[in-house]
């Protein structure tokens, strides 16, 4: 397989990481997470592109635009995980292998966070490992892509 390209999508309020509820989400900023992923992507020999939006439609547009450009999607839809049929449907429509990640363990939080519209259509879900959830998700996604060829 040639060098795979991965789209990393960050959902609403993730731009506030580092200052937003550090007891839940930790003190690592989104910029630091992206830097860590860039370093990991280099060692995994993949290309990576980042996009963050607080707007559902923009995330849907990014998913649709990934078709033909990216081999995989690493997504933290944040609060949209629990509410967005549109993001779920966009992921299903493009059928690009995807991994869902969350900083916190969504199943140890409020009841409304226990349901993910995204989980049934992605390869897998990683949650509860803080910023490392992203790294674990990227490793799993690349492994999946390499073993499917």
Curated annotation (Swiss-Prot):
Involved pathway(s): Metabolic intermediate biosynthesis; chorismate biosynthesis; chorismate from D-erythrose 4-phosphate and phosphoenolpyruvate: step 3/7
Annotated active site: 25, 102
GO molecular function, a single term: 3-dehydroquinate dehydratase activity
UniProt keyword Lyase, yes or no: yes
Any Gene Ontology biological process: aromatic amino acid family biosynthetic process
CDD domains named among the record's database cross-references: DHQase_II (cd00466)
Keywords: Amino-acid biosynthesis, Aromatic amino acid biosynthesis, Lyase
Database matches in HAMAP family: AroQ
Function: Catalyzes a trans-dehydration via an enolate intermediate.
Family: Belongs to the type-II 3-dehydroquinase family.
Protein name: 3-dehydroquinate dehydratase
Primary gene name: aroQ
